[in-house]
Structures are given as structure tokens and as C-alpha cells.
Amino acid sequence: MADQRMDISSTISDFMSPGPTDLLSSSLGTSGVDCNRKRKGSSTDYQESMDTDKDDPHGRLEYTEHQGRIKNAREAHSQIEKRRRDKMNSFIDELASLVPTCNAMSRKLDKLTVLRMAVQHMKTLRGATNPYTEANYKPTFLSDDELKHLILRAADGFLFVVGCDRGKILFVSESVFKILNYSQNDLIGQSLFDYLHPKDIAKVKEQLSSSDTAPRERLIDAKTGLPVKTDITPGPSRLCSGARRSFFCRMKCNRPSVKVEDKDFPSTCSKKKADRKSFCTIHSTGYLKSWPPTKMGLDEDNEADSEGCNLSCLVAIGRLHSHVVPQPAGGDIKVKSTEYVSRHAIDGKFVFVDQRATAILAYLPQELLGTSCYEYFHQDDIGHLAECHRQVLQTREKITTNCYKFKIKDGSFITLRSRWFSFMNPWTKEVEYIVSTNTVVLANVLEGGDPTFPQLTASPHSMDSMLPSGEGGPKKTHPTVPGIPGGTRAGAGKIGRMIAEEIMEIHRIRGSSPSSCGSSPLNITSTPPPDASSPGGKKILNGGTPDIPSSGLLPGQAQENPGYPYSDSSSILGENPHISIDMIDNDQGSSSPSNDEAAMAVIMSLLEADAGLGGPVDFSDLPWPL
């Protein structure tokens, strides 16, 4: 016993003595004790539970049943979730089959993309929702062909289908021959833009364009991150598939050209007129519709681009739009007068035309823009309208013209009556433009002698009758220019420009004189313009019409080359003697404004002769020797 005690004490002393490994052993011992405690506790609990199970077999059975119930509940939940996912997938597949854009896809789409396309399809159909479907339009006793013939007969036009991507004519009815004189085989497969007027191509492209085919609007696949090719994307309702379209455009008419031979004019002009295709105004009404390319049965040039995309087309009926001339109102029924509004520059050129002018004049607004109004006035009315032009530029009051004739598109004339007023810039105190309200005058009003509408015979004389015809010789006749119907004056577009320059020159002279400091530059009617004896002055006849002195023209120039309207610079003055300014001064060495105008007239003659619009140019009118 003593030896055993000694061994125990020595062991304890060795254990308690400090050493290099004491700290490590102590830390390990401490953690080991804790672990042993935990293990002992857990083993004790497990032992107690085992003892309890041995003692109570019912508790062990309940534990097993509890574990079984948990396992069964998990399996039932998994089955429920699986059935829910399967049902949701079946619904999404069914939804994808109902949406046209998803149905046309070559690959399977993810769920998010299908839902997006379905939402966009519902937005597209929202604007076209009606209590009746497309099939209900047609009665049951009518076939599709019979309905098509009835619609074409009632519309008095032709049916056409145009692809929105390239403007290709996919279908056109046989009735197009009655309007455009083209057969059905001539147009199918061709580009619509080849038969449109160049100024109307951009307008038609705007009508054909839709956000359906815009690449920047395509959806993104949630899985791959790549853009999804689709034909239905968010956008304004008027740009979605199924939106209605209504627009005017000019299309070529295959009319047989009439060969006109005139030896008095260059052959180049007649060739240009003969080769030029005539156009007619077509009113197209329809809507955009999409079909999958597999249902169209068409050969696409680029299958890679068309794969997975619907074919968006314009289905429309084209009708020949003829200008409307109002019928006389019978009895005491008062109807609103037919009128349109136009805006002109100070030289008379159109800068804005109301859309109502198309129904009255048969011109589209873009046809009139940039042209002078004097090109459409009858030559008998130019004198009165030129005087009104001067008055509206000099006063702030509204000027009402007499009834005058205006040339419409078919070459005939319509009677109009206009109210003009000028708009002055409040800062620059200069006239910016002229606003004209043009009213159609009915034939019965002219015949009845209504005092509010003066007779055409009561208008001032033409500009030729206001001026002397020459040195006692006969009055010069106006040559007929190819392509310009009779009744209008050749080169009349220069009249407005010369009137504007005349008024601006008077304003400049009055503005520079000391006596005009206290007066407005517009109130120039009280003081007469400068006399022709002054350098660069102009001699004005009654009504403000400038005269040409006899010394301003060379002898015999007024009778030379009567067949060529622009043979030389003097012929330009001879065509419009009523608005011509004294371009040639007696002193040819002075640098007056008239010399500059004479030089400009010679340059214009050179340009016209180079373009084939005139004959040889006579340089004798130049104010300086060559």
C-alpha cells in the first residue's frame, strides 16, 4: 500500500511540475475533459432513452409512427408540388399554342418569355376588341370570292396586299386595270415604291412601318439572354398589328403617251414630257395584319431573317380620288362655303397648304409647296392679283380679291375668291408671310350677280392691256409652252419675286431718306416712288405697274424669235412687260441696280438655254462690252 501511494504521489508531482509541454497538455486536457463531459452527458441521455424504450415499448412505437407521418407528409407535399408544376407547365404550353408569336417559334421558349408575349398579344387585341368577330362580317350564304367582288364593286377600287418589311406587292385584284391600267401579273411581286411618286415614298413608308418589326423593341429571352424574334411588341395602338391605315398617295398610271410634234420648240422638252409617267391620286384605306410565313406559302429571300417572325402586311382598298367641286345649294339652305387656307412667302410661293385643298384643286400639298401662286392664275387675272399683292405687302389691312380663275390639276380652271393679310414680325418690322383664305365661288353666284362676289368681267384688265403694245405695232401673242395648259402665263413665277424686290427696294429707299424717320416703312403709299430719271429708279404706271422705257430695249428685239419664250434677255422682259423693271440704263458704265438685274437676266437665259428651255442667248443686253 505504501509503495502504491508513493507511485501515485510521484505521478501527481510529475503532472503538477512545470515543463515545456505543460501548457499544451493542460489545454488539451481541459478541452478533453469538456468533451468527455459532453460525451458522457449524451451517452447518458441515450442510455436513459434506451432504458426508457426498453421499459416503455409504446413510446418507441409512437416515435416510429411520428417519423412515418413526417415522411409521408413530405412525400405528399412533393407530389402536390409536382402536380402543380405539371399543371402550370401544361397551361403555359397551351397559352404558347394560342399566342401566334409563340406558336411560330422554331424552339421552345421559357415560361417568362411566353408570359411576356401573351401580355403583349392581349395589349394588341385590346384596341381591336369588338362584340363580333371577323367571321361574323360575312353572311353565311356568301362565299369569300363573292364577298370580295361585292366589296370591290361597292368601293369602286382595287384590293391590294403589301408586305410591310420591303413594300412588296403580294396580291392585287384584277380591278386595278380599270384604274391604273396595269394588269394583275404586272404588279404582283413588284415593289410598291417603284410605282409611287418620289415625294410620296416617305409618307407610304411611314404608314407601312410599325414597331412590330423594330429590332430595338424585341424581347429578351430570360434563359439565353438573346433577343427573341417576335412581331408584337409594346407601342402605340396605331402602330400595332391590326391598326387601321388611311392615306393618300400618287401612283403611276400606265396611260398610253400621246406623241406631240411641235417644230417650234426643242425636241428635248417633248421627249421629257412624253417619257414622263402620269400619276393619279389614290386613297388607300385598310389595316395591318400578321400571318405566320408558313401559312402564306411565299418564298422569302432571306429565310434566316424570316424564321420565327410573322409576316406583317397592309391589306387595303385603293380608290381613285377625284377632286370635289361643290354643287350649287338649292333654295334658302345655307351651306358652309368650301374653302382652304394657304400661306405664302412675300414673293407668292406656297409655304403651307391646307389639306382641304386636295379635295378642291386635286393637288396634294407637297405638289404646291415651293411653287409660285402666279403659275396657277389665269393670265387675265394677273394684273388685279398683282395689285392686291402689292397692297397686302404695303398695308396691314385685309385685302379681298375679286373672283379669279385658278388652274386645277386636270388643266381646267376653278373660280376662287381670296382674303389676304400679311403677318409682320414684331421685332424686325418686316413682313414674313401672307395668309390667304381661298373660297370657292359657285357658278350660280356668278350668274346671279351677287354684289358680294364681283363679276370676272368687272375685274381690272389684264396686264398686257394695261401697257402699250409697242411702237404702234400689233400686240405680242403669248407662245404656248409644252406641258403648260393654255390660260396661264409662261414664266409667271417670276412676277411675285419681282414685286417683292420692288417693294423691298421702296422700303430701303424710304428707310434711308431723312424725311422717313418719323413714318412707318409700310406707309409708303402717301409718297410717290422715285422717278425713272433717277439712277436705278422705276417708272410706275397706274395701279403701281412699272413701265419699260423705249430706250431700255434694243430695236427689233421684241419681234425676234417669237417661237422661243426665252431666246434672249429681252424676251424675258417681253413675256412679262407689266412687271418688268427698267433693267438697262442709258449709262452703261454705271453700276446701278438695274445693271445687276440685266446681268442676272442674261445669266438666267444662259441657264435656261443650257437646260433646253430656250434658244440662243443674245449678249447685246449686257451693260458692259464683252
Curated annotation (Swiss-Prot):
CDD domains: bHLH-PAS_ARNTL_PASD3, PAS. The modification N6-acetyllysine is found at K538. Residues 51-60 have a biased composition (Basic and acidic residues). Keywords: Acetylation, Activator, Biological rhythms, Cytoplasm, DNA-binding, Isopeptide bond, Nucleus, Phosphoprotein, Repeat, Transcription, Transcription regulation, Ubl conjugation. It is found in: Nucleus; Cytoplasm; Nucleus, PML body. The keyword Lipoprotein does not apply. Residues 402-445 form the PAC domain. Signal peptide: none annotated. GO terms for molecular function: DNA binding; DNA-binding transcription factor activity; E-box binding; protein dimerization activity; RNA polymerase II cis-regulatory region sequence-specific DNA binding. Residues 17-32, 511-521 have a biased composition (Low complexity). A motif (Nuclear localization signal) lies at residues 36-41. Transcriptional activator which forms a core component of the circadian clock. The circadian clock, an internal time-keeping system, regulates various physiological processes through the generation of approximately 24 hour circadian rhythms in gene expression, which are translated into rhythms in metabolism and behavior. It is derived from the Latin roots 'circa' (about) and 'diem' (day) and acts as an important regulator of a wide array of physiological functions including metabolism, sleep, body temperature, blood pressure, endocrine, immune, cardiovascular, and renal function. This is Basic helix-loop-helix ARNT-like protein 1. It comes from Nannospalax galili.
